[in-house]
Amino acid sequence: MTFQSKKFPSTANTNTFAAKYRAMMKKHPFLLFGLPFMSVIVAGSFILTPAAAIRYEKYDRKVRQVSREEELGLGQRKRRVDIREEYYRLAAKDLDNWEQKRVERLKGESDGLL
């Protein structure tokens, strides 16, 4: 004795939209699934292209090309750095004379004291 692999369709389920769609899907799978899927992909591409263009235009406005005159003027305000001078300046600081101060806590926050 063997059991059938096909389930017996009840009459309540055969009249629904989903049952009719499943039956039509077996006959025309590309028309009812493939074509709508591909059209959504193509339409999404056309819709998202301007969004990507806006993103790159915003980036281009932020990063602009610097002219030669502006480029030459940018480096004039910099301080010349000598490694020996920086070493002596940092060595002259009094790093041993300091006092620890507690940061004021927010209301309701634990202060960490035991």
From Swiss-Prot:
It is a single-pass membrane protein. Required for the assembly of the mitochondrial respiratory chain complex IV (CIV), also known as cytochrome c oxidase. May participate in merging the COX1 and COX2 assembly lines. It comes from Neurospora crassa (strain ATCC 24698 / 74-OR23-1A / CBS 708.71 / DSM 1257 / FGSC 987). Belongs to the COX16 family. Pfam families: COX16. This is Cytochrome c oxidase assembly protein cox16, mitochondrial. Keywords: Membrane, Mitochondrion, Mitochondrion inner membrane, Transit peptide, Transmembrane, Transmembrane helix. It is found in: Mitochondrion inner membrane. GO terms for biological process: mitochondrial cytochrome c oxidase assembly. The chain crosses the membrane at residues 29-49. GO terms for cellular component: mitochondrial inner membrane.
